[in-house]
Amino acid sequence: MKRVLCAIFIAIVASGVAAQSVDNASMSRDVGAVLDAWHAAADAADEEKYFSYFASDAVFLGTDATERWTRDEFRRFAHPYFAKGKAWSFKSVTRWVTIAPDRKVAWFDEALATPHLGPCRGSGVLVATSAGWKIAQYNLSIPIPNDLVDEFKKRIEGFGKEKSTNKAP
């Protein structure tokens, strides 16, 4: 009898773990679909759709150290690009998604192919809402090969000094 009860208990626990794994895989696909649609909206210069994927308190971190924007600040920055009929084009090459145990938060990182910036990396956090997954934070970066870091470090430091010495009094 103990063996039967133990086997039943193990079967129940195992089925719950398997169901959660399937559910997490489904949620990961949903997050991926949101990100793909978000990138497609930028490529199509669909400003309304693009910004509908952001949470109201979202933050966008751009490639420049000065680029930390709320959703609304980023929209003001990006509006001229969308208004011209072509914003930007990011294609996810690889993507990894992790779903939090409470299934209300997901984080990801993705390698991106872009025609204007070259290889990039996007990472961020999405939150589950009654309207679906929303981007709470997105960080766009340009990976620098380790062998080039010293060169870029010097150029960035020099750029900062050059900008500070060229400021009007």
Regions found by a protein language model. Give the residues of each.
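Surface-exposed, charged secondary-structure patches
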Residues: 20-23, 30, 60, 73-119, ...
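Bacterial N-terminal signal peptides
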Residues: 6-16
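A short, structured loop/turn motif at beta-sheet edges
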Residues: 97-104, 126-134
